[in-house]
Design a protein with these regions (language model features):
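Residue-level recognition of tetratricopeptide repeat
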Residues: 36, 70, 104, 143, ...
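TPR-adjacent "capping" and linker segments in tetratricopeptide-repeat scaffold/adaptor proteins
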Residues: 20-30, 337-343, 375, 437-441
Length: 631
């Protein structure tokens, strides 16, 4: 059809008129050619007038509407351009260029107006079907799929077109798609390739920094940040981020040095001062750190970050009530009703989490219920409190109600979908829950697969969790979260050797992953195997996060298993200071006292553990019974 219209438009050009001058075909042809000539000469207003006249004379001509759309887009009149491109595609559904232009206009607008994403996807999909080998269309469609939350479809669109491997736009979109769909092993290669294609590309550099941070490879991130700092010496946020990533990567002395230099140069840099405070705290200089954070709060009582940082530092030192008081003071400053409702909700959600950690469950639930779901979305910490209490109190209907509210507020969040399915199964609506988990497990996005595996683990269906995670690892090679879930599920099914192999594979990819070092080291220690190796792992985990109570407990436990009771007491006591309401730490302290023959002290710890909801209360009760003490 398009060829027919083109023929009519150019018919007889330069020859004697075939039709009378008033013939509409002649009028359209002359007006169209006048528009094209004016456009070529840069006379855009004249061209626009002629194109509009041509569209009036030939309202059913797709080429006229398309050319008008192209000019309007060039002139920045995007809304009218989109209308004309859509009209051209409507008149000729096989007009690939019209579909591509309509989709491109929607895609350009979608960054600021997400409501344009679906129409961008629809138009670009039609263009892609009409010209499946067009690399520009494939790259644009992939970008649209990314914006729609379907990175799996984005990658598929790129795979449809051979020869895109060296296309700069495709390299970028491929990296983003693999990252967002959770194909971490492939994404690592993609980001390396993107940056190698042009090391001076700032977008590639900053995107790579964010990617490596998300992978918790802070060493790589710091190297790239330093490269960026060399190019942008006056970029203070880059310097701040170097200090922060050194801290997050366990390089505490370097982080302190960087942060001190920043503070000396710019005392008003609050971010650098917070990082310095955190570096001091993690190196055991908590008094200096607290003093610094309190000074930040005194200087600006309305800074929520300083208040939350101080609160969690105090909580980590076993000072829960003091931590809660810091945040409550901040909330009180916002007034009632609060001057900043969403900020108040966020901080109160943190209070709910601290109350829960202190086992003040009723208070935690009350605040969590008031803050879990708001107009800005879900407060993860509050919702977590409500769901965990629903499990512990065996109130699955409550859990289902809250999970559905969260899923309604954030329909794209797979964790809430998994929670809905979990509580549907708990309430007896098994068919609905099973279907949701099956759909998540089959997803082309790793985060959804992980949500299904996590839900199965919460339901204590460890074999199913392991199977889902194993299938996911095959499809999303190098996804460390799925690998970790696979290892933990295998461990819970008693497959210790298989679990160990998975965790060791993670450590080959990320040798300083503190959580993996802790899990694997504790697993070996608890089973009484490979104790020297377990101790080295746990010492490394503690070196990476010295104030982590769970890591300290694990290190104390492996020392106990090796009969190094002095070191066991040292680390278990530190763990008890950090997490005084932890049942496992109290049980381990009881076992330590029993090994020493101090049965009265052992029973005190075991009884304390029983009040803290241990995973295996019957085992602890048996220890008390066997000791001869009164239950």
């Amino acid at each position: 059809m398009r060829a027919k219209w083109l023929l009519l438009l150019v018919l007889g050009a330069g020859a004697a008129p075939v039709f009378a001058a008033e013939d509409p075909v002649i009028a359209v042809r002359e007006t169209f050619l006048s528009a094209k000539m004016a456009e070529a000469e840069g006379k855009f207003e004249q061209a626009l007038g002629d194109f509009r006249k041509a569209a009036t004379l030939a309202p059913d001509d797709p080429v006229v509407h398309f050319e008008l759309a192209v000019l309007l887009q060039q002139m920045g009149v995007d809304d009218e351009a989109r209308k004309e491109a859509g009209r051209a595609a409507e008149l000729d559904p096989s007009f690939e260029s019209a579909w591509r232009l309509a989709g491109a206009i929607d895609l350009a607008a979608a960054d600021k107006d997400p409501s344009r994403v679906p129409s961008a996807v629809a138009a670009l999909e039609k263009a892609h079907r009409l010209a499946p080998q067009n690399p520009g269309t494939a790259a644009a469609l992939a970008r649209a799929h990314l914006l729609s939350g379907r990175p799996d479809l984005a990658r598929a669109a790129l795979d449809d077109v051979p020869g895109l491997a060296d296309n700069p736009a495709a390299i970028k979109v491929r990296a983003q798609a693999d990252d967002k769909r959770g194909a971490d092993g492939q994404a690592r290669q993609d980001y390396d390739r993107w940056l190698a294609s042009d090391p001076t590309d700032r977008d590639a550099l900053t995107s790579s920094i964010e990617f490596w941070e998300s992978q918790r490879d802070f060493g790589r991130a710091v190297d790239l940040l330093r490269q960026l700092r060399r190019a942008e010496a006056d970029n203070t946020p880059v310097a701040d981020r170097i200090a922060l990533d050194l801290l997050r990567g366990g390089r505490f002395a370097e982080a302190e040095k960087e942060a001190r230099a920043l503070v000396a140069a710019r005392p008003e840099d609050r971010g650098a001062r917070r990082t310095l405070a955190a570096a001091l705290d993690i190196q055991g200089r908590s008094e200096e750190s607290v003093e610094m954070l309190r000074k930040l709060i005194d200087e600006d009582p309305d800074d929520p970050t300083a208040a939350v940082t101080l609160a969690y530092q105090l909580s980590g030192d076993g000072k829960g009530p003091e931590a809660i008081a810091v945040l409550q003071k901040f909330v009180d400053r916002l007034g009632a009703p609060p001057s900043k409702p969403e900020l108040s909700r966020e901080v109160r959600s943190e209070i709910a989490g601290l109350l829960y950690g202190d086992r003040r469950f009723d208070e935690a639930k009350k605040i969590a219920a008031e803050t879990a779901v708001g107009k800005d979305g879900v407060a993860d910490r509050s919702l977590g409190v409500l769901l965990e209490r629903a499990r512990d109190e065996n109130r699955p209907a409550d859990g289902l109600a809250w999970a559905k509210k969260a899923a309604d507020a954030e329909p794209g969040n797979p964790d809430w979908k998994g929670a809905v399915a979990e509580f549907e199964i708990r309430t007896g609506a098994r068919a609905e829950g099973e279907k949701t988990l099956a759909d998540l497990a089959r997803s082309g996005i790793a985060g959804e697969v992980l949500a299904a595996a996590d839900a199965r683990e919460r339901l204590k269906d460890f074999a199913a969790s392991a199977q889902i995670a194993a299938d996911g690892v095959k499809r999303f090679e190098g996804n460390l979260d799925l690998m970790f879930r696979l290892g933990s599920a295998l461990e819970r099914t008693g497959k210790i050797d298989e679990a160990g192999a998975v965790f060791e594979e993670i450590l080959k990819i990320r040798p300083d992953d503190a959580n993996t070092l802790n899990y694997l080291g504790y697993m070996y220690a608890d089973k009484g195997i490979r104790l020297a190796e377990a101790r080295r792992m746990l010492e490394r985990a503690v070196a990476l996060d010295p104030q982590n109570g769970a890591f300290l407990d694990s290190l104390g436990w492996v020392c106990f298993r090796m009969n190094d009771l002095r070191e066991a007491e040292k680390f278990l006591s530190k763990a008890a200071q950090k997490i005084p309401a932890d049942a496992t730490v109290q049980e381990h302290l009881g076992d330590l006292e029993a090994r020493r023959g101090q049965m009265a002290e052992a029973v005190v710890h075991w009884k304390r553990s029983l009040t803290l909801s241990p995973d295996e209360p019957e085992k602890i009760a048996k220890k008390i019974h066997d000791s001869g003490a009164t239950p």
